[in-house]
Amino acid sequence: MLKLKHYFKKFWAPILLCVGLLFLQSQSELALPDYMSDIVSVGIQAGGFDSAVNDVLSIETYNHLYVMMDEDDQKEFEDAYRFVESADLDEDTKEKFPQAQKQGIYELKDLDSDEFEDLEDIMVKPMLMVTSIDSMDVNSEEYQKQFGSLPAGMTPYDAIAMMDEATKEQMFSQIDAQMVTMGESTLKIAAGNGVKAEYEKLGCDSATVQNEYILQTGVKMLGVALAGTICAVACGFLASKVGA
């Protein structure tokens, strides 16, 4: 034991470095499946949109989302966005969202991480509801079953806006119960598709957004894999030096 202690004192730095490199290698290997999952779920299934929070919203969609919220959420939603007239849009926004030049848009303000997470929690349910309603064919059996009794000229959003808070709360409770069974991954994909639909509505090239997300995530994945490989090689080299 004393002899081992003597050799350990001589090589303590390389040994500790090997332990650190092995830890980094294991972390990189554990991270790779997450990146692959993001490429499949977000990059492919959700079109590259990984959040329920839109950077921009059309006036119509903003109003539709608004009526799907209770009063507290409406206040936070209002505080998170600002309306920009079409004449005041910057060139990058005009280029990315051509349809915004016809009407103006609501732009997301600069939020800190906590504010963004709170807004995302607020917007998931309304985004799913709006996407579901907007994707329905007005002549379909499902639409007629749910909204066929509405007076002529009244939309589902008009009807929901006329509800009192108690009726809204009852409706939201039923939707919450359905959302619980969907799972976090499914909710994320569905919300991402809602954001994608809104971007396309404003003229954005969603295919470019998707390709950029897949490319960026793929590059990160390759970087993590390369880092893990370097750690493995370096650890093997140091271990051989210590063993020699």
Give the location of each predicted region.
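Membrane-integrated ABC transporters
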Residues: 1-32, 38-221, 231-239, 243
